Amino acid sequence: MSTGTEKITINIPGMSNQEIKSSLISIYDKINKPPTKEVGYDLFLKLVHKNLYAPSQMNFIINHVSEFITPLEPKEKDPCMKLLSLIFYSPSSEEESIDSKIYFPYLSPVLTTLQNLIKDSNSTIFPTISNVFAEIVQNIMPTDIEASNIELEQEEKTAYEMMQGFCIYNMKYDDKSNRIVGSLCLTKLVENCPVVLQKQYMKLIWEVIMNLIDKKNFNAKYELLNCLISLILGAENLFTPYAHNTLYKVLDFLADTDWLKRKLALNVIYTLIFYCKDEILPLKEHIISFLRALKTDKVKEVREVCLLILKIFSENEPKNKENTKDKNKSNFSSINNSKKKK
């Protein structure tokens, strides 16, 4: 997001609460009008950066935004919730760059706001909550997420653990809304966190997913399967030690009455074959025994993935690994964007 060409000025100790309140009211008005929405976001960024080094003022901003968003209707909440992620936005230019660690003290109150929004909102706002969460992860985690040799500072690890804790707490909570949002957010965390953190916490995340998949009354398994796919795609061949147990957990979903779950289970198997083929291919006859019925599944998307897996088995392995890898990620991107079951 553009913040203009002016250099950001940091004022210490910051603006008065009355000045902040007046600015926020003007910003809310602009955000709720499409023609001035981006202007409102830019003004909010400048407001945050003016008060960034004044914790009491920053907490006042967070509390005011939280109290403003909570009573809004879902359609009104959507554009305003982006303010919660903009709190952590650092300009990309070297001239205006801000050390991401300065944002860490504000992570806890913002996550508390998201937690309250789960309780006070209906399901239409859940994707927005997860998208805001993803933007927060992107804004405060190291930008080079593919680097496996970077050393994270303790503050960065603590911030990650706080966000991971938010996800797992909601996934284990005895309410469908929390479970859905927790699973959606964990998917975003896995997709946007540095590789070094994926390696460190993969076993913990995998165990959480496996334990919840086992629970018959866990009513967010569509989101959970999506999360599992993202975990495998992020880990790639490092997922090998977990391949066998994962396979046996998802095979039961191939007989599920929900076609979306059947399709996602097939996607998990397809991803496992690609990244952990030495573990999975010896079990192909066992897997095929589950796939036979799906060759004539009434849902086209299910049949297509089933036939693709059978084709891979018949060839024993992908002919062109690099091309298959690109196609694999493209297929899952389109599949996961399919209409979700309500």
Range-by-range predicted roles:
Residues 2-22, 35, 39, 286-342:
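Eukaryotic acidic, Ser/Thr-rich intrinsically disordered low-complexity regions
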Residues 12, 47-57, 87-106, 123, ...:
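Flexible helix-coil junctions and inter-repeat linker/turn elements that act as hinges
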Residues 27, 43-50, 65-69, 80-94, ...:
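Hydrophobic residues within the alpha-helices of tandem HEAT/HEAT-like
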Residues 32-33, 72-73, 121-122, 174-175, ...:
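Short inter-helical turns and helix N-cap capping residues of alpha-solenoid HEAT/ARM repeat scaffolds
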Residues 60-63, 68, 73, 123:
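N-terminal interaction modules that seed assembly of large macromolecular complexes
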Residues 261, 268-272, 276-290:
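Juxtamembrane loop segments immediately following a transmembrane helix
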